[in-house]
């Protein structure tokens, strides 16, 4: 074997070793049991609900999303969930936030009963075998945790247990994400209005009907964004 071949083999072995280390490190849980980190892309997932419907990460694209891992036997979860319902879900559900509870390894009838007991109205999904949980945290770690995803699917905030200070910080993060998302939507709307304005200038009067529907749709969208903006302003007073 010549020197060039030996050098090539050494590089291949080194790259393989680095790859193994990278994979092992990425699956090593932190002190809270997480195997994902803020800034990571969310693992892909498909969630099944007791009513037979499904949702996936792709379906949530463009939305701010909060995943709440829970179980009926978890006392801390039962303590936290009414706060999620009152302080997060009811405040932001019509302003662009999705909240999904993910119940660890329990059947549909137990989950439905659990939701009624803790009086939450946000949806609870099934997680048989804790397979969804294991995408985000070590399977053997504690269940009570929340994960906030930005509109781009990146992980923005992670919580563990129910600590008021951390919970309040999560609310501020969610609010900020929704404010930023609303600003992006308003900027996009303004750009569309500008395009329509330019189109009208170059359209003969008898063809302007084609832009009227676009104007009507934009007007409705603008009203909806203004409504969300007012609700966000009111919500900010409570942070």
What role is predicted for each listed range?
Residues 13-23:
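Sec-dependent N-terminal signal peptides
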Residues 27-57:
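N-terminal "domain-start" segment that seeds a small globular fold
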Residues 28, 38, 42, 177-239:
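Non-globular targeting/processing and membrane-anchoring segments
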Residues 64-65, 144:
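Alpha/beta-hydrolase fold active-site loops
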Residues 69-86:
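Conserved redox-active cysteine motifs that mediate thiol-disulfide chemistry
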Residues 89-130:
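Conserved segment of the thioredoxin-like fold in thiol-based oxidoreductases
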Residues 118-121, 127-173:
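Thiol/disulfide oxidoreductase modules built on the thioredoxin-like
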